[in-house]
Amino acid sequence: SLYDELIYALIADSEQALLFCEKYSPLFDFDYVYEPAEDILGLIYISCKNIDSRKATGSYYTPTKIVKKLIEKLDIASDARILDPCCGTGNFLLQLPAHVRFDQIYGNDTDTISVKITRLNMVLKYDILSVKTLYEHITEADYLASDSKTSYQYIIGNPPWGYEFSESEKEKLRKNYRTASGKNIESYDLFIEKALRNLSINGQLSFILPEAILNVKAHTPVRTAIMESNSIRYLNFLGNAFDKVQCPCIILQLIHTGKPLSTVGMEVSDCSHCTTILTNRKISAEYFSFHTTDAEYQLLEKKLRKKADYFSD
């Protein structure tokens, strides 16, 4: 069966697997209940991975409550193409709404075991009968190295943070990505740049990212790329949302308009309040700041104009 094939694909050494079963036989005395849309396999896998390996690849397991928060802000059409370019074990794809069919979904990752777990998760959630279709939609591939021009209506996920590229990789990336121009190359900047190329007009990108992308100078090139032909639809300040990771993060949802950035209709949220920007603000790629309400922003603008008039006199 398809289940058997996918499970055996996960087991690299059958003898070692049998020894494990014998050694830890009490584990098999428990009654396990399948919870739909819960990525238990992925959680176990990422928990068992060496911490140094996780840091080197920038891989951290995204809490399901954050994934759900991201997905809930997307109004996904019934015929839309959806991509998670760094799908890990498939947690984001598992949380997609019930009306989404598997033939709309695409995911890839460079981690072999993660891809195998994603395939198994997809078979558990969706009525998939074709191995060929499964392997075509969930692939082991390097998104950043791909020259695919395929367009998607939604690109979602949690791209790697702080991936350690080799010197040869950096050389190749600098030829293909404007956000790779600095001394230190940040992986999530590259994923944003690449994803924006693959979005259809009015398509949406929604990533979980470090808050630093909004204001740290090194990320000016990616902010410039965002401003050129996209607008920010939703920004949620999550704080330190990852266990034992001291790094404030955000949900950043962009819409690819094909026009310069406009702040009109942008929703900004944090743990205490939510506001919608109704005016088109002056935004610089040097620093993205959206903490003020429209009234506060207009007051600040008024004070700045007065100061400018004073010095011009």
Map each language-model feature to its residues.
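Class I S-adenosyl-L-methionine
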Residues: 1-124, 142, 215-222
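Short, conserved active-site loop motifs that form the nucleotide-linked donor/cofactor pocket
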Residues: 136
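Signature of N6-adenine DNA methyltransferases within the class I
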Residues: 62-66, 87, 93-94, 102, ...
